[in-house]
Amino acid sequence: MNQKDTRKETLEFNKLQKRLRRNVGNAITDYNMIEEGDVVMACISGGKDSFAMLDILLNLQKAAPIKFEVVAVNLDQKQPGFPEHILPEYFETLNIPYYIVDKDTYSVVKEKVPEGKTTCGLCSRLRRGTLYSFAEKIGATKLALGHHMDDIVETMFLNMFHGSRLKAMPPKLRSDDGRNVVIRPLTYCREKDLIKYAEHKDFPIIPCNLCGSQENLQRQAIKAMLIDWDKKTPGRVEAIFKSIQNVSPSQLADRELFDFVNLPLDRDGSREEYEFSEAVVSSTNIDESLFIDVTNI
């Protein structure tokens, strides 16, 4: 690569980095994800998204107007072939506090899920429960997950097509028991940007299919659909995401969100005070010159 190409590549990466940092900063501000004194537990799986999230959070931490801590946590689920040395070595180079949590959820999943079925759903639930418990143990006030805009839109369509529910992933969520708050700092970030960012940063990425399970085929189909839309109509994924931010319950059909039963008219006077006028036009007095001869069309 010549000097001109190197300069161009550096310029493009700088633009990408600024865009991602700006998107993360805006998401944090819009949803009040991180507050003064927070201990943010960054959940690192070893994939491109969580690596990028950690990298961006650490950079924003240096310039943020508030003080907060970032603690990296990886859950070692004892999958066969998982390179246990990679993440500790990486965290050491960053000189940040970190924990490796050993929890053999792999054996549980293999025992519960029939052969040939995807294990991702149960694996995810077990992982979430373990991380919730560990967050309390270390005093973390926020759990940061690496889901991005594409994940959120994909999840919405998954729930629509296969669950008949208009539901996605919220940027910020309080757990059902009220004991943890989950944040998704990459909410405004596109996956294609994160792929480029990870490639340039050369993160030590660990594949997520060490367990032998394949990604849910339904999600694969939706991901392919969004990629196709993105090629044919750039900006469509962003537009769909914005629609999630601009919901009009009265224009949908959920009776729990909007009271369609009690819709009184805002009019003065009683119904008896109104009079009906005669119809202006009836079927017997229409001007026949207005008709169009369509026999030869």
UniProtKB/Swiss-Prot annotation:
Pfam families registered for this protein in UniProt: ATP_bind_3 (PF01171)
Cofactor info, note text: Binds 1 [4Fe-4S] cluster per subunit. The cluster is chelated by three Cys residues, the fourth Fe has a free coordination site that may bind a sulfur atom transferred from the persulfide of IscS.
PANTHER family associated with the record: AMINOTRAN_5 DOMAIN-CONTAINING PROTEIN (PTHR43686:SF1), SULFURTRANSFERASE-RELATED (PTHR43686)
Record-level GO cellular component terms: cytoplasm
Note: The thiolation reaction likely consists of two steps: a first activation step by ATP to form an adenylated intermediate of the target base of tRNA, and a second nucleophilic substitution step of the sulfur (S) atom supplied by the hydrosulfide attached to the Fe-S cluster.
CDD domains assigned: TtcA-like
Subunit structure: Homodimer.
Cofactor(s), names only, from the UniProt record: Mg(2+); [4Fe-4S] cluster
Compartments, record wording: Cytoplasm
Record's catalysed reaction(s): cytidine(32) in tRNA + S-sulfanyl-L-cysteinyl-[cysteine desulfurase] + AH2 + ATP = 2-thiocytidine(32) in tRNA + L-cysteinyl-[cysteine desulfurase] + A + AMP + diphosphate + H(+)
Motif (PP-loop motif): 45-50
SUPFAM superfamilies: Adenine nucleotide alpha hydrolases-like
UniProt keyword annotations, A-Z: 4Fe-4S, ATP-binding, Cytoplasm, Iron, Iron-sulfur, Magnesium, Metal-binding, Nucleotide-binding, RNA-binding, Transferase, tRNA processing, tRNA-binding
Family: Belongs to the TtcA family.
EC class name: transferase
Lineage of the species this protein comes from: Bacteria, Pseudomonadati, Pseudomonadota, Gammaproteobacteria, Vibrionales
General function of this protein: Catalyzes the ATP-dependent 2-thiolation of cytidine in position 32 of tRNA, to form 2-thiocytidine (s(2)C32). The sulfur atoms are provided by the cysteine/cysteine desulfurase (IscS) system.
Enzyme Commission code(s) on record: 2.8.1.-
Domain of life: Bacteria
GO MF annotations, alphabetized: 4 iron, 4 sulfur cluster binding; ATP binding; magnesium ion binding; sulfurtransferase activity; tRNA binding
A biological-process GO annotation: tRNA thio-modification
Pathway(s) served: tRNA modification
Positions with a binding annotation for [4Fe-4S] cluster: C120, C123, C211
Protein name according to UniProt: tRNA-cytidine(32) 2-sulfurtransferase
